[in-house]
A protein has these predicted regions:
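Hydrophobic alpha-helical bundle architecture
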Residues: 307-308, 319, 325-398, 410-419
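C-terminal regulatory domains involved in ligand/effector binding and gene-expression control
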Residues: 76-254
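Alpha-helical support elements that line or immediately flank enzyme active sites
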Residues: 18-35, 295-307, 352-360
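Conserved phosphate/anionic-ligand binding catalytic regions in large, soluble enzymes, centered on
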Residues: 9-27, 278-297, 340-349
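An N-terminal structural lobe/cap that precedes and organizes the functional/catalytic core
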Residues: 1-11, 37
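Accessory "access/gating" subregions that flank catalytic or transport cores
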Residues: 204-339, 447-455
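Short, mixed-charge aromatic SLiMs
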Residues: 45-58, 90-97, 316-329, 371-384, ...
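Extended hydrophobic packing segments that form well-structured cores
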Residues: 419-455
Length: 455
C-alpha cells in the first residue's frame, strides 16, 4: 500500500481524528454514495448507529455532530468551525436535515442517531453503520464504516485493508519497515526526507509537495497562535480552564526564551490541544489527540535552532511522515485499538526522528531518535476523563513534545547504533496494545476516567 505524507497530515476539526474527522468523512461518503447510486432524491430517512469506542465516548468527542455535518456534505478540511454547533442545534430543533445540503429529510436526533456504549463490531473498535430508507420504509442503502485512526476511514468492502483507499501507486523507493528504509538510504546516499520527497513525486510535483506541506505548517502556526491567545472554559462539562494564553504572557514577561525553551515547547503543544478540545481547526499529526506534539517541536526548531528555515520545515514533515507510515503499516495510530501509545507515542516518535533529521542527523540517528521516542511511551493508556480530549490529553502532549526533543538530542550524541530497533519497538507497541484491556482504549471505562469525579 502507498501512503502519502498528506494522508498522515490532514487539516480537520477537533477534538478527535478517529471520533470526529473519521465519522464526518464516513457520513459524507455515505451521502455521496446515495447520490452516486442515484437514490438521493428518494431518501425519506436515515439512521446511524455508532459502536465500540465511538459509542462509548462519542458524545465527548463530538461524534454525533460530525455525523450530522458529514451527512449534510461538510468536509473536515473546509467545515465552518465557528458555525458547526449552531447548525447542529438547528437540526435538532427543526427535526430536518439536508443531505449533501441538497435533499431535505426528517431526522430525529434521539431516534435516528444511536450510540451503543457496550456493543462493538468485529473488525475495529470504531465502527458505525448508516442506513437510508425511502418513504415506504424500504432500505435504499446500508454501509458500515470503520474509523481506524488519524482520520483514516475504511468501509466494509475493504475490511482488513486498514486504509482510506486501496492505493497501488508505484513509488520510487517503496518501504514497509525501518530496516528497509535504512537500507534504501544507504544504497542511494539520500536522507530520509529526500527519499520521501522522491516517493511523494508519484502524486504531486515538487513545488506542489513543498507548498502543500508549508500550507499545513501555516495551519499549525495559526492553531498555535489561537491557542496562545484564547482564554476561558473548554466545552464538555469538566470545566477545564485554558492555560496556554496565561502561560504565554508569563513566559514573554520573564524574557530569556532560550533559557525557557522546554517551557515554550510545552506551551506550544498545550495551545494546540486546547484548540483541538474546543473543536477548532487542527492538523492530524498523525491524530487529533496527539496534534500538539509535532507543531510544538516544529516551533522549537524554528524559534530555537540556528539556521532554521522553511526548507527545514519541509524536510521535518517528510521525515516525520516516513516514520508515521511505519506505525500505520505495522501497528496502529488508533487509541481505540492500542491505547494512547499509538497516538501520543507515535507522534513523539515522528517528532523525535524529524527533529534529528533537520539537526543534521544521519538516517541511523533519525531511526534511533524515533525509536527512543516510542520506547518511552510503551504501555500508555487512553483513559480520557468524561470521554473528552482534555484530561490527560492536553498536558500529555506537552510532556511528549519535550520528550521528543530529548530523544532527538540523545540520538544526536550517538552514532546511530543501538540495541532496540524502531521495527522492534513498533512490534512491541502493537503487541502491548493487543494485550491492553479495552478499559484503557478510549472507552472511558478505566484509569483516570473512572477515578476522577466529573464536576
Amino acid at each position: 500500500m502507498a501512503i502519502s505524507v498528506f494522508d498522515l497530515f490532514s487539516i480537520g476539526i477537533g477534538p478527535s481524528s478517529s471520533h470526529t474527522v473519521g465519522p464526518m468523512r464516513a457520513a459524507r461518503l455515505f451521502a455521496r454514495r446515495l447520490r452516486g447510486e442515484e437514490v438521493l432524491g428518494a431518501v425519506a430517512s436515515v439512521r446511524a448507529e455508532l459502536y465500540g469506542s465511538l459509542g462509548a465516548t462519542g458524545h465527548g468527542h463530538g461524534t454525533p455532530k460530525a455525523v450530522l455535518l458529514g451527512l449534510e456534505g461538510a468536509s473536515p478540511r473546509t467545515v465552518d468551525v465557528e458555525g458547526a454547533d449552531t447548525r447542529v442545534e438547528q437540526i435538532k430543533e427543526s427535526g430536518r436535515l439536508r443531505l449533501l445540503d441538497d435533499h431535505e429529510i426528517g431526522f430525529s436526533f434521539d431516534d435516528d442517531l444511536i450510540l451503543h456504549r457496550r456493543k462493538t463490531l468485529p473488525y475495529h473498535a470504531n465502527g458505525m453503520t448508516l442506513w437510508a430508507y425511502d418513504a415506504s420504509g424500504a432500505e435504499l442503502l446500508s454501509k458500515t464504516y470503520y474509523s481506524v485512526g488519524g482520520g483514516f476511514v475504511v468501509d466494509d468492502d475493504a475490511v482488513g485493508a486498514d486504509r482510506i483507499k486501496l492505493d497501488d501507486t508505484a513509488l520510487k523507493y517503496p518501504f514497509r519497515t525501518g530496516d528497509e528504509l535504512l537500507r534504501l538510504a544507504k544504497e542511494t546516499g539520500l536522507s530520509i526526507s529526500a527519499l520521501m520527497l522522491e516517493n511523494e513525486r508519484a502524486w504531486r510535483t515538487e513545488d506542489e509537495i513543498r507548498s502543500g506541506l508549508l500550507d499545513i505548517w501555516r495551519v499549525m502556526q495559526t492553531c498555535t497562535s489561537r491557542g496562545m491567545s484564547r482564554e476561558g472554559i473548554l466545552p464538555g462539562g469538566l470545566r477545564v480552564r485554558r492555560r496556554a494564553a496565561m502561560s504565554a504572557r508569563q513566559l514573554r514577561a520573564e524574557g530569556e526564551p532560550l533559557a525557557r525553551a522546554m517551557e515554550w515547547i510545552t506551551l506550544y503543544a498545550m495551545a494546540v490541544n486546547e484548540e483541538n478540545a474546543a473543536g477548532g481547526r487542527v492538523v492530524t499529526a498523525p491524530t487529533n489527540g496527539a496534534a500538539g506534539i509535532i507543531p510544538a517541536v516544529l516551533h522549537y526548531y524554528i524559534n530555537f535552532v540556528p539556521g532554521a528555515d522553511e526548507e527545514g520545515v519541509v524536510r521535518f514533515m517528510l521525515a516525520a511522515g516516513a516514520i508515521g507510515m511505519l506505525f500505520k503499516e505495522n501497528a496502529s495510530i488508533s487509541g481505540a485499538e492500542v491505547g494512547c501509545q499509538g497516538e501520543v507515542g507515535s507522534a513523539c516518535s515522528m517528532a523525535a526522528g524529524a527533529l534529528a533529521e533537520v539537526l543534521g542527523g544521519s538516517p541511523e540517528q533519525v531511526e534511533n531518535a524515533a525509536e527512543i521516542g516510542m520506547e518511552h511511551n510503551l504501555g500508555l493508556t487512553c483513559d480520557p476523563v468524561g470521554g473528552l480530549v482534555q484530561i490527560p490529553c492536553i498536558e500529555r502532549n506537552g510532556m511528549a513534545a519535550v520528550k521528543a526533543v530529548t530523544a532527538a538530542r540523545m540520538a544526536m550524541r550517538g552514532d546511530g547504533s543501538h540495541k532496540v530497533s524502531l521495527d522492534k519497538v513498533i512490534k512491541t507497541m502493537k503487541e502491548t496494545g493487543a494485550d491492553m484491556s479495552v478499559k484503557y482504549k478510549e472507552t472511558a471505562r478505566g484509569g483516570l476516567a473512572v477515578n476522577i469525579i466529573e464536576c
